[in-house]
Each structure stands twice: as structure tokens, then as C-alpha cells.
């Protein structure tokens, strides 16, 4: 594994932070909070507080690996739960919308079906999530917010719905839509920054055309739906430059970007290298790719015998095994996966210290030396 230059920088800059530390795997890290925003990938159980309708993720087999459905779109824990553990937070990240929940070490504001441009009534768009955070902001001190980590994973719903509703969209229309989504994303990040957040972790979009639901609905068989993948790639290409610009114009703005697209693509193309036997269909559901109906009481869903051999648990969401692997990469991997620094390095990077390295195009040869 390559050693990032930012790793050395993180060691040199850690000394001012020697108070309020937690020890994780022998390493001292600041005791800060974790706040997540986005869609169903990060929803810790918020959606059930926005509707009275029965939601499939509240029922078995969701939560199967933990024998406890908690409203998460997985067979068990999700990425933020593992990140919280790595950060020394003694419990899974709680849903912010749950009345009376302990949010002292952060919370999840993410909601299933959320998008950037606008969401249905039983969800919250990204800017609505940020406004909800602002309504609760008195729970945390200003300096605590500034030192905490803010993770964002969103955009899947925007592009999936656009593709379904505009199957024959011309290239110019696709480009215009990507621009509108990313411009709004930038505005929402600015809103969160103006609320006091300064340390951001942004997930790029996965190859959306490779989701089991995309293969099933667009009838691509074993192939991915490349039109959807192209939209994801266009979106991803704009995120890094947006964040670079913000870091260059706001001295206390710090960020890193997780290359979720290529992490998923590698596991799809070379699945046995990562010990996944099945990457093109879901563990739970019905249909050609078992991509519909998981958890619905009126659907006799097929459930795989061993979910840990699957990359996807349901139509759009990864298994707990995959989510844990992603969390390890986010927290401690090299720039081949997350750049310009990982979350461990971001945690110890001094507040108000300008960034010295920025996001680079992952097609750059030097970022392609190691595969994760």
C-alpha cells in the first residue's frame, strides 16, 4: 500500500490536537462528531418518521445480519455506522429525526428517496436536511461542529429518475441536467459550510447503471446500462473541481472525495478478487435480477442463502460486508481511493489550516498504481 504525502503532513500537524483525544487501534484521534446527509445509502432510520406508511426496510429480511431491522437499507450496518466506530463513537449513528435521541456525537440527517433537486413528501432534499441540521444546531458547540466530520452521499435519485423519465434525452439535455444538479449541490454545501461545518467527506456516485434495479428495469441482462453510468461519470467529474474551488477561496474549508464509482466498478468486474461471488443481482427481491419487493409483505421475495457472498443486498444497496469494506477504505485508504486525504487524516488536520493538496482527476496515471 502506498503512503500518502498527506499522511506525513497529518502526523506533523496532530500535536496541537492532543487534548480531547480518543485512542483507536493504538492511535490518538480527536473526540469529534459525525454528521451524515444524503439518500438511502446513509439513512439510519429517518424515513419512518416522515410517513405513516409501512416501509420495507423496517421489516425482515432488512437487518438480517443483526437480527434487527432498524430502518436501514441493508442486511445490517451501513457505512456511517462503521465510520462512527472507527472514530471512537460508542454507538451506531442515530437518526436525527428520532425524538429524544442522543445526538451528542452527531447524527444522520439522510433520508431514503432524497435527492438534490427535490424529493417526495416522505423524504427531505439535501437543502432540507441542512435546514433541519440548523434547527438542531443548539445541541452542539460551535467549535465542536467545526472539528466534526460531515459526510454526504446523494444524487442517485436525481439521475435515476431523470433517466427513467427522459429515456431519449439528447446529450445537451443530459449535460444541462448534470449542471443543474451539481450547481444546486454546490449551493447546499455552501449552506452547510455557513452553518459552521468545515470538514467534508463527499461520496462520488456509484456506476448507477450497474445497480440490479437498473439492469432489471432497463433490461440489459448481465450488462450495465451505460447511459446511466455516463450521467454518473459526468456528475463525478464536476464534484472535485467544485470542492477544490471552495477550498481555494475559503481557507478553513477542508474536504476529501471517496471514489465510490471505481470502488464498485472494480468489485463488479473482478468480483472474486474481493470475495464476492455475485455482483449483478440482489440477495433479496423478485424479478430477473431480484431487484423488486424486498421486505414488502405482499411480495414473496427470494432471499439468498448467504448474503456475504453478494455485493448488493437489495435493488440499490450494498450488503453489510461490502459497506464495512467501503468504510475501511474511507477511513484509512490511500489517494487511489479517497483523496486528497482519508478520514483519519481529515480528523487530525487542524481547523482553519488551509489545505495543501487538492483533488486530482483519478485518470491521472499516478493515482492508478494501486487497486482497492
UniProtKB/Swiss-Prot annotation:
Keywords: Glycoprotein, Hydrolase, Lipid degradation, Lipid metabolism, Secreted, Signal
GO biological process assignments: lipid catabolic process
Glycosylation site residues: 161, 280
Superkingdom assignment: Eukaryota
GO MF entries: hydrolase activity, acting on ester bonds
Residues spanning the signal sequence: 1-26
Catalytic residues in the record: 40, 314, 317
A Pfam family this chain is assigned to: Lipase_GDSL
Primary subcellular site in the record, as a coarse category: secreted
GO CC list: cytosol; extracellular region; plant-type vacuole; vacuole
Localization in the cell: Secreted
Similarity annotation: Belongs to the 'GDSL' lipolytic enzyme family.
Designated name of the protein: GDSL esterase/lipase At1g54020
Amino acid at each position: 500500500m502506498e503512503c500518502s504525502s498527506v499522511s506525513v503532513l497529518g502526523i506533523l500537524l496532530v500535536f496541537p490536537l492532543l487534548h480531547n483525544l480518543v485512542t483507536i487501534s493504538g492511535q490518538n484521534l480527536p473526540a469529534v462528531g459525525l454528521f451524515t446527509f444524503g439518500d438511502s445509502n446513509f439513512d439510519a432510520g429517518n424515513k419512518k418518521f416522515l410517513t405513516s406508511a409501512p416501509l420495507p426496510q423496517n421489516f425482515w429480511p432488512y437487518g438480517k445480519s443483526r437480527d434487527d431491522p432498524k430502518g436501514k437499507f441493508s442486511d445490517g450496518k451501513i457505512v456511517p455506522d462503521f465510520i462512527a466506530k472507527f472514530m471512537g463513537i460508542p454507538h451506531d449513528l442515530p437518526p436525527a429525526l428520532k425524538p429524544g435521541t442522543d445526538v451528542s456525537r452527531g447524527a444522520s440527517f439522510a433520508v431514503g428517496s432524497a435527492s438534490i433537486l427535490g424529493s417526495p413528501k416522505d423524504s427531505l432534499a439535501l437543502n432540507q436536511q441542512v435546514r433541519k441540521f440548523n434547527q438542531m444546531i443548539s445541541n452542539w458547540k460551535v467549535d465542536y461542529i467545526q472539528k466534526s466530520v460531515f459526510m454526504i452521499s446523494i444524487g442517485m435519485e436525481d439521475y435515476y429518475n431523470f433517466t427513467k423519465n427522459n429515456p431519449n434525452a439528447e446529450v445537451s439535455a443530459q449535460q444541462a441536467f448534470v449542471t443543474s444538479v451539481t450547481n444546486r449541490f454546490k449551493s447546499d454545501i455552501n449552506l452547510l459550510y455557513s452553518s459552521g461545518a468545515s470538514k467534508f467527506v463527499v461520496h462520488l456516485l456509484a456506476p448507477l447503471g450497474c445497480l440490479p434495479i437498473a439492469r432489471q428495469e432497463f433490461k440489459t441482462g448481465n450488462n450495465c446500462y451505460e447511459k446511466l453510468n455516463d450521467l454518473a461519470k459526468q456528475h463525478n467529474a464536476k464534484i472535485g473541481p467544485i470542492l477544490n474551488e471552495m477550498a481555494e477561496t475559503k481557507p478553513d474549508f477542508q474536504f476529501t472525495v471517496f471514489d465510490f464509482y471505481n470502488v464498485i466498478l472494480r468489485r463488479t468486474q473482478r468480483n472474486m478478487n474481493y470475495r464476492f461471488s455475485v455482483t449483478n443481482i440482489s440477495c433479496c427481491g423478485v424479478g430477473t435480477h431480484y431487484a423488486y419487493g424486498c421486505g414488502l409483505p405482499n411480495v414473496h421475495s427470494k432471499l439468498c442463502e448467504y448474503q456475504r457472498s453478494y455485493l448488493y443486498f437489495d435493488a440499490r444497496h450494498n450488503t453489510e460486508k461490502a459497506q464495512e469494506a467501503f468504510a475501511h477504505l474511507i477511513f484509512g485508504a490511500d489517494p487511489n481511493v479517497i483523496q486528497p486525504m482519508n478520514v483519519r487524516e481529515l480528523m487530525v488536520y487542524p481547523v482553519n489550516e488551509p489545505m495543501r493538496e487538492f483533488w486530482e482527476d483519478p485518470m491521472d496515471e499516478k493515482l492508478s498504481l494501486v487497486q482497492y
